Design a protein with these regions (language model features):
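Short, extreme N-terminal segment that most often corresponds to the first beta-strand
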Residues: 1-28
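Charged interaction segments
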Residues: 21-99
Length: 99
């Protein structure tokens, strides 16, 4: 598929190493074009191919199971096909929402 998926993310964790690993994965596997860090969380935007590679990200997060403070929310949209998907990682479990 050649359609691009525009994604917004919110990342919260107390572990700086986990934060770096997730941001590095996003930078290497997509086009990270907005990064807004604050004390409590990091928000940003990136572009990926549609559909969003959720399984690859789930495998990466699966390696970080020890971090119970990790919260990651990604909302993916494709304005051409009206595709909307949400992926949320909270308390060690993934939740996926389609609209």
């Amino acid at each position: 598929m050649n359609n691009l998926c525009f994604n917004r993310f919110t990342l919260r964790t107390d572990d700086a190493k986990t934060r770096r690993k997730i941001l590095r994965w996003l930078a290497l596997n997509s086009r990270l074009y907005e990064y807004l860090p604050s004390e409590a969380e990091i928000r940003g935007r990136f572009i990926s191919r549609k559909p969003f590679p959720a399984e690859a990200l789930r495998r990466q997060i699966g390696k970080l199971r020890g971090d119970r403070t990790l919260f990651l929310r990604i909302v993916s949209t494709d304005l051409y096909s009206l595709y909307v998907e949400g992926n949320v990682y909270l308390l060690g479990a993934w939740h996926r929402i389609f609209l």
